[in-house]
């Protein structure tokens, strides 16, 4: 929005030309989202406490979590607000990729909000019925995927980028819609499952978003895209603004979510952030890269699948409790140790993922 205004004002003062630089807008996008999160934090926490929107804690969970009961939740609202405002201010409003991300972000945020509302207000521990949650998540994911397929049919925008292999980018055709669906819905749920400890989900989200900011910049630059043998996508550059907004909003939220947390993001935050990372990976044609950089989310999800599958097939559990972060808690690891070690692993995976762009 401000970019368009600056384009009209540059004729009167050349200094407004700085708004045309992607690097400048990326930095101010991050700072804008960060400051909005920091400003909203105390006000949001006080409001949630006044409304008694407190966290519901399972009775069969680790005993250390019982003290978290009543901690304000639904703090993801401030994350979504910070991201949306920052993106609308600093990204080109005419960019279709930006609107794709905002559609998934806000759509999944609404689904998460309804889920949280049922849990904390109606005291329904199950929240939104699972089939309805997946139905609406699927509607949004399939709608966006179908629109992208129609817009990018038989172009690099619907090719599959395979890591480690130079110029191996098969055209997916209709399989693009199916892949996009699973990536968006799967990542939304994966981040949701990871959000079980103070700050555990938000920092890997920040790391992955930062990694995708670099990938988006390279993908939107023809010279670097050709150098790295990845598809050049002319709309991809503006995703840098979206990614840096996620980084800023995430760091601002972490200020209040770090152990011991003053607020939790709730499903309104985790589903939205996961869906946003998923659609960004789809837009950049880097679904495989998301699996590497978001390895923490993948392992958390696999631990639940393996736990449920093992119990149904063999009547035995593999882990003491799933997702796997609870397994380490029950082994005696202090919560901060689990969190920080998962952060370190996440950072390593993001760096490894970025390195694969050159190893071809």
Curated annotation (Swiss-Prot):
Annotated transmembrane regions: 26-46, 72-92, 94-114, 132-152, 168-188, 199-219, 236-256, 263-283, 288-308, 338-358
Major enzyme class: transferase
Keyword field: Cell cycle, Cell division, Cell inner membrane, Cell membrane, Cell shape, Cell wall biogenesis/degradation, Magnesium, Membrane, Metal-binding, Peptidoglycan synthesis, Transferase, Transmembrane, Transmembrane helix
Topology relative to the membrane: Multi-pass membrane protein
Principal location: membrane
Pathway: Cell wall biogenesis; peptidoglycan biosynthesis
PANTHER family, alphabetized: PHOSPHO-N-ACETYLMURAMOYL-PENTAPEPTIDE-TRANSFERASE, PHOSPHO-N-ACETYLMURAMOYL-PENTAPEPTIDE-TRANSFERASE HOMOLOG
Magnesium listed as a keyword: yes
Organism: Klebsiella pneumoniae (strain 342)
GO cellular component labels: plasma membrane
InterPro entries linked: Glycosyl_transferase_4, PNAcMuramoyl-5peptid_Trfase, PNAcMuramoyl-5peptid_Trfase_CS
A GO biological process held by the record: cell wall organization
Record localization: Cell inner membrane
GO MF annotations, alphabetized: metal ion binding; phospho-N-acetylmuramoyl-pentapeptide-transferase activity; UDP-N-acetylmuramoyl-L-alanyl-D-glutamyl-meso-2,6-diaminopimelyl-D-alanyl-D-alanine:undecaprenyl-phosphate transferase activity
Family: Belongs to the glycosyltransferase 4 family. MraY subfamily.
Cofactor(s), names only, from the UniProt record: Mg(2+)
Catalyses which reaction(s): UDP-N-acetyl-alpha-D-muramoyl-L-alanyl-gamma-D-glutamyl-meso-2,6-diaminopimeloyl-D-alanyl-D-alanine + di-trans,octa-cis-undecaprenyl phosphate = di-trans,octa-cis-undecaprenyl diphospho-N-acetyl-alpha-D-muramoyl-L-alanyl-D-glutamyl-meso-2,6-diaminopimeloyl-D-alanyl-D-alanine + UMP
Protein name: Phospho-N-acetylmuramoyl-pentapeptide-transferase
């Amino acid at each position: 929005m401000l970019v368009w205004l600056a384009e009209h004002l540059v004729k009167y003062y050349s200094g407004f030309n700085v708004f045309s630089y992607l690097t400048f807008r990326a930095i101010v996008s991050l700072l804008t989202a960060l400051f909005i999160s920091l400003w909203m934090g105390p006000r949001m926490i006080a409001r949630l406490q006044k409304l008694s929107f407190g966290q519901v804690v399972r009775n069969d969970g680790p005993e250390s979590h019982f003290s978290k009961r009543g901690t304000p939740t639904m703090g993801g609202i401030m994350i979504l607000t910070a991201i949306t405002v920052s993106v609308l201010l600093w990204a080109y409003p005419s960019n279709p990729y930006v609107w794709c991300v905002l559609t998934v972000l806000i759509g999944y945020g609404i689904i998460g909000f309804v889920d949280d509302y049922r849990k904390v207000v109606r005291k329904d521990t199950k929240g939104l019925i699972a089939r309805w949650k997946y139905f609406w998540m699927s509607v949004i994911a399939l709608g966006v995927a179908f629109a992208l397929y129609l817009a990018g049919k038989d172009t690099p925008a619907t090719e599959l980028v395979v890591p480690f292999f130079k110029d191996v980018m098969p055209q997916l055709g209709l399989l693009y819609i199916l892949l996009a669906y699973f990536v968006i819905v799967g990542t939304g749920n994966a981040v949701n499952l990871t959000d079980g400890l103070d700050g555990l989900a938000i920092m890997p989200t920040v790391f992955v978003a930062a990694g995708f900011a670099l990938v988006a910049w390279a993908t939107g630059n023809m010279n670097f895209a050709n150098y790295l043998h990845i598809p050049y996508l002319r709309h991809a550059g503006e995703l840098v603004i979206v990614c840096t907004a996620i980084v800023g909003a995430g760091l601002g939220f972490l200020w209040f979510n770090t152990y011991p947390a003053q607020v939790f993001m709730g499903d309104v935050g985790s589903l939205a952030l996961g869906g946003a990372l998923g659609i960004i990976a789809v837009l950049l044609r880097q679904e495989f890269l998301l699996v590497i950089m978001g390895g923490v989310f993948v392992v958390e999800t696999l631990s639940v699948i393996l736990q449920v599958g093992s119990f149904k097939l063999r009547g035995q559990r593999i882990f003491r409790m799933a997702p796997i972060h609870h397994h380490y808690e029950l082994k005696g690891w202090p919560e901060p140790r689990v969190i920080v070690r998962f952060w370190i692993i996440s950072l390593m995976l993001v760096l490894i993922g970025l390195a694969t762009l050159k190893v071809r």
